[in-house]
Structures are given as C-alpha cells and as structure tokens.
Swiss-Prot record:
Similarity comment: Belongs to the universal ribosomal protein uL24 family.
Purpose of the protein: One of two assembly initiator proteins, it binds directly to the 5'-end of the 23S rRNA, where it nucleates assembly of the 50S subunit. One of the proteins that surrounds the polypeptide exit tunnel on the outside of the subunit.
TM regions (residue ranges): none
SUPFAM superfamilies registered for this protein in UniProt: Translation proteins SH3-like domain (SSF50104)
InterPro entries: KOW, Rib_uL2_dom2, Ribosomal_uL24, Ribosomal_uL24_CS, Ribosomal_uL24_KOW, Translation_prot_SH3-like_sf
PROSITE patterns: RIBOSOMAL_L24
Protein name, entry field: Large ribosomal subunit protein uL24
Source organism (scientific name): Rhodospirillum centenum (strain ATCC 51521 / SW)
Keyword annotations: Ribonucleoprotein, Ribosomal protein, RNA-binding, rRNA-binding
Domain of life from the UniProt record: Bacteria
GO biological process terms on file: translation
Length: 105
C-alpha cells in the first residue's frame, strides 16, 4: 500500500492532548502505522549517560497513530484527506481531496 503520509509532510493532530497542533513528520514507522511529529506528543525519557552523551531527563517525540493525524492542504492550510492520481506522464502522485491540489512534485 502506498504511503499517504511521508517524512517532511506538514500534518495536524486530530485527537489527544496535542489536538490542533501542527508540525513536520520527522519519522514514519510503516510496520506499526505510526508517525513522529516534531514538537508534538513529547514524553520525558530517562537517559543513561554514555561516554559521548550526558545522562539525565530528556524530552523526545513519541509516535502517534497515523489515523490521529491529517495532512495539511497546501492550498487552504486546512486538514484534508489524501488520495492518489496518475498523471499523463505515468507518475502516481498524492492529491489533497479537499482542493485537488497535488502534494508531490
């Protein structure tokens, strides 16, 4: 199945404590159907010291389920669903369902 949300996409969180926040996808975990979004769903992690890094409590992004985020329409800047369309040259691209705007270039 083709990925509707990919790395570096702009998304908005639909549910949970960070509802309404927007951010950039920094990692996609396709086997778990999860994504990590920059600055969203921060959790505190107790980091053990290593020879190169100091220990302590650090905040990292935890993964969100892909159903809890929506792509931001490049034309209207509102949440939208994503579909696929084949262009004349044979390329398969993602399109915003709300405006019909092509997401991939």
């Amino acid at each position: 199945m083709a990925a509707k949300i990919r790395k570096n996409d702009r998304v908005v969180v639909l549910t949970g404590k960070d509802k309404g926040k927007t951010g950039e996808v920094i990692e996609v975990l396709p086997k778990e159907n999860r994504v990590k979004v920059r600055g969203v769903n921060l959790v505190k992690k107790h980091q053990r010291p290593t020879p190169t890094q100091q220990g302590g409590i650090v905040e990292i992004e935890a993964a969100l389920h892909v159903s809890n985020v929506a792509h931001i329409d490049p034309k209207t800047s509102k949440p939208t669903r994503v579909g696929f369309k084949t262009l004349e040259d044979g390329r398969k691209v993602r399109v915003a369902k709300a405006s019909g705007e092509i997401i991939d270039l």
